[in-house]
Regions:
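Short, solvent-exposed loop/turn segments at the edges of secondary structure
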Residues: 4, 55, 70-71, 87-94, ...
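Ligand-binding clamshell of periplasmic/extracellular solute-binding protein-like
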Residues: 60-73, 125
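Ligand/substrate-recognition segments at binding pockets and active sites
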Residues: 1-66
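Glycine-rich loops and low-complexity Gly/Arg-rich segments
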Residues: 35-37, 63-67, 83-88, 145-150
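Tryptophan-rich aromatic "cage" segments
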Residues: 133-156
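Short, low-complexity, polar/charged sequence segments that are solvent-exposed and flexible
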Residues: 28-34, 60, 78-82, 139-144
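Extracytoplasmic/peripheral linker and loop segments enriched in polar/acidic and small residues
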Residues: 39-48, 73-136, 156
Length: 156
């Protein structure tokens, strides 16, 4: 139909990191199979940072090192140091704040995060494992992928 517009996305990536540039190209190829037009903007460090800070992107490939307490505040809180492109008033951010204040539980936050999906982790450089007796998990995890069924974990 002539009146239909094709969905078009711009992915911003730092060209100085070959792994991230390759990831952006791979995502582009996958999305184009779904008939989504994708432009990958491979930028030098200075231009990349400026593009991300300005919000002139649909997606960006970035890297975040979480603090030892695994706080998502830099991503989900208003004024967070890496909250680029994230609606810090959205459902995930609101649920995270409620969880931190103790007025809501972890499952409610996870459900809101999954529905809102403010960011998508593409990979993890190193994994950690924690355990509490209240954690109930399936048996699909494996030594090479301890988070394989994280979406089914529950706290009781």
């Amino acid at each position: 139909d002539a009146n239909k517009k094709q969905l078009a996305l711009r992915i911003v990536v730092n060209k100085d990191n070959g792994f991230k540039a390759a990831a952006a190209q791979s995502i582009k190829e996958m999305l184009e199979k779904l008939k989504i037009s994708v432009t990958v903007s491979e930028l030098g460090e200075k231009d990349y940072r400026a593009a991300v800070a300005s919000g002139k992107f649909d997606m960006y490939i970035g890297e975040v090192k979480l603090t030892d307490n695994m706080s998502l505040s830099p991503l989900l809180k208003s004024g967070g140091s890496v909250a680029y492109g994230i609606n810090t008033s959205g459902a995930a951010s609101t649920a995270y704040s409620a969880f931190l204040s103790g007025s809501s539980d972890l499952n409610t936050f996870i459900e809101a995060f999954n529905a809102d999906m403010p960011f998508v982790p593409l990979c993890y450089r190193s994994g950690i494992a924690i355990y509490t007796r209240t954690l109930k998990y399936g048996n699909k995890n494996h030594i090479n992928d301890i988070y394989a069924d994280i979406d089914s974990w529950d706290f009781h």
